[in-house]
């Protein structure tokens, strides 16, 4: 329940409707103040909201002179009151979320208006002004769930590669049992084809698919291909954006892909842009729709130094080197976009067919390709384009059925999902369960609870081996605050090991020598 001046759970039907009608006026005031609607739009928006909320007439009372940064708390109240009116099944969380989006959709500008405003700002004031406006629109309409994002638990952990950023992801609401039951009864639908398709704009949603009445996208052309720019509703970093292809087609990694990434950063030089790999295990969660991700953020990987400088005499304008990073990566630096792309394509082409059995790298097995890259590009006014190419391999074995270069089983208690683009850049997105589990482990180290992780059915059973290691290292008499810090630090250390698992060239002498051999095969020499 939102924070209100009075308890909205004990209202009479008349009081409830009066409160809802006043909330409509509060939402309209918010919309006007944040330039979502103009004075001429108010009547239409009001009548739309009255219809959605089954209200006969608007409020005669004046709304309080408030100006919240986001409408989240107000929408929470309106959804709760609407649930009390049984306008939807309030016991199903997804219905609450979808109804909230439907309410806010009444204040949304049309897609054509958004695109026109974005393009006008881009032409007259530049890329940054255009994205500033578009991002703020998505915040003001609660499309970007800032209140939920603020619940995430975040910290940094020092490692030999620099500080890694750890996030326990609490943004996406967990499914309640009723939602899960209803999903089983939901008929299969192929519309929209996936969460990224342009057809999501204005979509009403269903029990297993979010409503998108507040969703807007902006067309951009990248290397001759039609893409759309949007923001992520549950952003993992500042101005987390997604560039999706207009067609629902699979992810690819080739010369065209790199050209599209360079074109995007050329048009939006204040944004980082990267792509998930195009193969299972080392790719992201959506391989079926070609897209990139980016944002106005400096990732830990971008702060890493070159460990082994290298040169290719064919491209004197491009600096290169092996990065000091757990996921094996090559860094290229140069001012010429075309030269940078040429070098990057040489590396990609060479890596696709590269085999070095001495370090477990096979380019293919029975015709199935294993090698690909995860590219990350940003622009620096001093140095020019900076491209990091993380080398990936998705081979499996009997010992590692989930992937040889994938989180190993001993770390699955912390991270077992794919190491995608965001993790490669040094930002861990960890499951919500670690919030309570981490706190309980800290209590064990502080002597505030017994270690029952070996008992059948214990909630910490998945961490049993790890807890034994922590007790051996720290004991069980720590100060509570020190225990919490220790657990967070150890989680970060596990993440660094997970990234090392994903590295195709290991951090030992043999692995680094093999990395140099690969670079030499492309045409590089040590500087």
Place the predicted regions along the sequence by residue.
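Beta-rich nucleic-acid/ligand-interaction surfaces
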Residues: 280-288, 366-372
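Helical scaffold of the NTase/Pol beta-like nucleotidyltransferase catalytic core
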Residues: 214-216, 246-271
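Catalytic or ion-translocation cores adjacent to nucleophile or general acid/base/metal-coordination motifs
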Residues: 256, 265-285, 294-348, 352-355
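Intrinsic structural disorder
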Residues: 1-2, 265
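Active-site microenvironments that recognize anionic phosphate/pyrophosphate groups
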Residues: 2-243, 247-250, 324-326, 340-344, ...
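Coil-to-beta-strand transition motifs
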Residues: 238, 270-272, 285-287, 300, ...
């Amino acid at each position: 329940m939102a924070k209100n001046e009075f308890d909205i759970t004990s209202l009479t039907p008349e009081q409830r409707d009066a409160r809802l009608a006043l909330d409509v006026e509060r939402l309209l005031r918010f919309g006007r103040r944040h330039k979502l609607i103009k004075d001429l739009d108010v009547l239409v928006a009001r009548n739309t909201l009255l219809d959605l909320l089954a209200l006969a007439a608007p409020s005669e009372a004046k709304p309080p002179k408030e100006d919240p940064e986001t409408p989240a708390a107000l929408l929470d109240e309106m959804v709760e009151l609407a649930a009390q009116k049984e306008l939807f099944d309030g016991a199903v969380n997804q219905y609450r979320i979808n109804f909230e989006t439907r309410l806010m959709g009444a204040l949304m500008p049309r897609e054509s208006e958004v695109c026109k405003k974005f393009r006008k700002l881009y032409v007259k004031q530049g890329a940054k002004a255009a994205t500033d406006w578009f991002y703020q629109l998505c915040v003001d309409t609660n499309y970007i769930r800032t209140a939920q994002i603020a619940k995430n638990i975040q910290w940094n952990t020092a490692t030999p590669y620099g500080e890694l950023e750890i996030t326990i992801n609490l943004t996406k609401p967990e499914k309640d049992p009723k939602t899960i039951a209803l999903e089983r009864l939901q008929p299969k639908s192929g519309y929209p084809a996936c969460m990224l398709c342009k057809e999501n704009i204005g979509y009403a949603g269903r029990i297993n698919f979010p409503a998108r009445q507040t969703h807007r996208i902006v067309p951009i052309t990248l290397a001759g291909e039609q893409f759309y720019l949007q923001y992520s509703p549950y952003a993992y970093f500042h101005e987390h954006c997604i560039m999706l292809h207009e067609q629902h087609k699979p992810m690819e990694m080739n010369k065209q892909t790199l050209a599209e990434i360079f074109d995007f950063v050329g048009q939006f030089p204040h944004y980082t842009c990267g792509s998930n790999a195009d193969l299972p295990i080392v790719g992201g969660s959506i391989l079926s729709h070609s897209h990139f991700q980016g944002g106005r953020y400096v990732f830990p990987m971008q702060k890493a130094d070159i460990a082994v400088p290298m040169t290719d005499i064919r491209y004197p304008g491009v600096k290169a080197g092996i990065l000091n990073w757990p996921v094996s990566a090559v860094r290229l630096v140069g001012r010429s976009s075309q030269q940078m792309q040429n070098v990057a394509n040489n590396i990609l082409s060479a890596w696709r067919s590269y085999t070095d059995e001495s370090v477990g790298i096979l380019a293919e097995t029975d015709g199935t390709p294993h090698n690909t890259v995860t590219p990350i590009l940003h622009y620096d006014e001093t140095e020019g384009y900076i491209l990091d190419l993380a080398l990936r391999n998705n081979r499996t074995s009997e010992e590692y059925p989930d992937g040889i270069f994938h989180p190993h089983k001993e770390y699955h208690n912390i991270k077992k999902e794919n190491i995608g683009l965001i993790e490669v850049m040094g930002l861990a997105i960890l499951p919500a369960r670690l919030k309570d589990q981490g706190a309980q482990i800290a209590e064990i180290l502080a002597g505030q609870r017994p270690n029952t992780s070996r008992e059948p059915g214990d909630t910490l059973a998945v961490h049993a081996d790890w807890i034994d290691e922590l007790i051996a290292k720290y004991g069980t008499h720590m100060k509570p605050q020190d225990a919490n810090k220790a657990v967070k630090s150890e989680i970060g250390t596990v993440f660094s090991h997970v990234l090392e698992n994903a590295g195709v060239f290991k951090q030992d002498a043999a692995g680094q020598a093999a990395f140099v051999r690969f670079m030499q095969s492309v045409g590089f020499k040590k500087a």
